[in-house]
Amino acid sequence: MAVVTMRELLDAGVHFGHQTRRWNPKMRRFIFTERNGIYIIDLQQTLTYIDQAFEFVKETVAHGGTVLFVGTKKQAQEAVQVEADRVGMPYVNHRWLGGMLTNFQTVSKRLNRMKELQAMDAAENGYEGRTKREVLMLTRERTKLERVLGGIAEMTRVPSALWIIDTNKEHIAVAEAHKLNIPVVAILDTNCDPDVVDFPVPGNDDAIRSTALLSRVISTAVEEGKKAREERQLAAAKDAAGDAKPEAEEAPAAAEAEEAPAAEAEEAPAAE
C-alpha cells in the first residue's frame, strides 16, 4: 500500500511552489512547470522521495533512534506538535535556541530547571515562604521555558534525525545537524537549497494542509519503526528463551546418566 497517494498530495496543495521570482535555481530538477507566475512541483518525484524518506525514518526508529520534529513557522506549529505527540517524539515548534544540538549539555540544564519549577508549581506548598512578586517571576520563568523547551522535555540526548519544515527559516537547526552529522529530512519548497538536506521531500512548506499531510507521513514512518522494533525485541526474547530451554532439559538428563552407573554398582552382587 502506498504511503500517500497522488490525489492526497494534490488535495493538500503540495504541488504549489513559490512565485517564479522567488526560487532557488538548484530546485530546477524538482519543478514540473510554471503556471500563472507560480512554480508547480513535480509530484511524481515527490512520491519517490517520500518513499525514501519514509524508509529511512522507519529504519532509524526501528534501530532505537529518535526523530526531532522542527517547524516554528505559524503554518507548521500545530502539525509538528500533533504528529510528534502522536508517536512520542520530541519537537520544537516555537523558537529554535542556538546550541540546542551543538550545546545540548547546557540545554539539559535548562530542562532540569524547567522540571524543577514544574515540580514546585505542582507541590501543595511549593511556593511557601515566597512573596507574590517572587511567585510571579518564577511562574513567568516556567512558562517561558515550557514554551521553548516543552517539546523536548523528555529528550536525554541529541536525536538520530531531524524532520524540518522550511529549511530556510530553520537554517540554524540545519547547520547544527550538519555539524553533528545528524541526517536531515525536510520539505523542499522551490526557494530552498536541496544541498543541505539528506532526505528531501519536494513540496509546499507554506500551506497548513501540506505541512500537516507530510508531517503525518513522517509520524507514520515513526509508528511503523516502533512496531518493527517491538517485533525484533519479541523475536530476540523468544530466541533467547528457546536457547535456554534445551539447556534446562539437558541438565536433568545428564544427572540421570551420572546416577545410573552408581545405582548399577550398588545392585551388583559382591564377588566371593
UniProtKB/Swiss-Prot annotation:
InterPro entries referenced in this protein's UniProt entry, alphabetically: Ribosomal_uS2, Ribosomal_uS2_bac/mit/plastid, Ribosomal_uS2_CS, Ribosomal_uS2_flav_dom_sf
Keywords: Ribonucleoprotein, Ribosomal protein
Biased composition (Acidic residues): 256-272
Gene Ontology biological process: translation
Region of interest: Disordered: 224-272
Stretches with biased composition (Basic and acidic residues): 224-233
One protein family per Pfam: Ribosomal_S2
GO cellular component, one term: cytosolic small ribosomal subunit
Molecular function in Gene Ontology: structural constituent of ribosome
Transmembrane segments: none
UniProt xrefs under PROSITE patterns: RIBOSOMAL_S2_1
NCBIfam families: rpsB_bact (TIGR01011)
Family note: Belongs to the universal ribosomal protein uS2 family.
Name of this protein: Small ribosomal subunit protein uS2
Species lineage: Bacteria, Bacillati, Actinomycetota, Actinomycetes, Mycobacteriales
